[in-house]
C-alpha cells in the first residue's frame, strides 16, 4: 500500500483562492523536475499519466480541491487524462520516453505551495515504474469502482469522479496523519 508519508506539514492548510493550474503546466513541471535532475531518469508516457493522476487524486484527498483542470478516465492501463494522452499520442506510445524537448513551457510558474505539494507526491511515487504505478492504481477503489463490472482488459472511458478521489485518498490521508 503506497501513500505519501507524513511531512507535508501546513503547506495546504491555507486555503488560497488562485487561478486553476493548467494540466499542461503541471505536466511540463513534472517532466522538467524529473529530467532536469537526471536526464537519464525514466519517464515513460504511462508513468507520466499515473504521476499526474496521483497529484490530482491526493490534492482532492488532502485539500478537497483539484490541483489542475483535468479529469481522469479509468482506462485499461489505469487512470488516464485524455487531453495529455492526445498531446503525446501522435509521437509517443504508452512506453515511449518523455523528454524535456516534449515540454510546451520550459518556464512553468506555479505557486510555491503547489510546487511543494507536487514535489511531495513525486518523492513518494517516482521510485515506481510505470507498470508498478499501473498495478497500484488497479488496486485502488476509485479505478475499480469507476470500471464497475468491466473485465480488466475491457475498454473504459468513464471518468473517475472527484468524489471518489476525495473519499478514498481523504481516508488514506486521515490514516497517515493519525
Feature roles, as predicted:
Residues 1-15:
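Single conserved hydrophobic/aromatic residue that forms the stacking wall/gate
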Residues 14-178:
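Domain-edge interaction signal
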Amino acid at each position: 500500500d503506497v501513500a505519501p508519508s507524513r511531512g507535508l506539514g501546513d503547506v495546504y492548510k491555507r486555503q488560497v483562492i488562485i487561478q486553476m493550474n493548467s494540466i499542461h503546466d503541471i505536466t511540463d513541471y513534472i517532466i522538467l523536475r524529473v529530467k532536469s535532475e537526471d536526464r537519464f531518469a525514466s519517464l515513460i508516457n504511462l508513468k507520466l499519466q499515473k504521476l499526474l493522476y496521483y497529484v490530482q487524486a491526493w490534492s482532492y484527498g488532502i485539500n478537497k480541491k483539484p490541483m489542475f483542470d483535468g479529469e481522469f478516465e479509468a482506462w485499461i492501463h489505469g487512470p488516464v487524462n485524455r487531453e495529455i494522452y492526445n498531446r503525446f499520442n501522435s509521437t509517443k506510445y504508452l512506453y515511449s520516453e518523455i523528454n524535456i524537448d516534449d515540454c510546451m513551457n520550459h518556464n512553468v510558474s506555479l505557486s510555491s505551495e503547489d510546487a511543494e505539494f507536487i514535489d511531495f507526491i513525486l518523492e513518494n511515487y517516482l521510485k515506481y515504474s510505470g507498470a508498478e504505478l499501473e498495478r497500484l492504481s488497479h488496486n485502488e477503489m476509485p479505478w475499480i469502482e469507476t470500471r464497475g463490472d468491466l473485465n480488466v482488459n475491457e475498454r473504459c472511458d468513464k471518468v473517475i469522479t472527484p468524489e471518489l478521489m476525495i473519499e478514498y485518498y481523504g481516508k488514506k490521508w486521515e490514516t497517515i496523519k493519525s
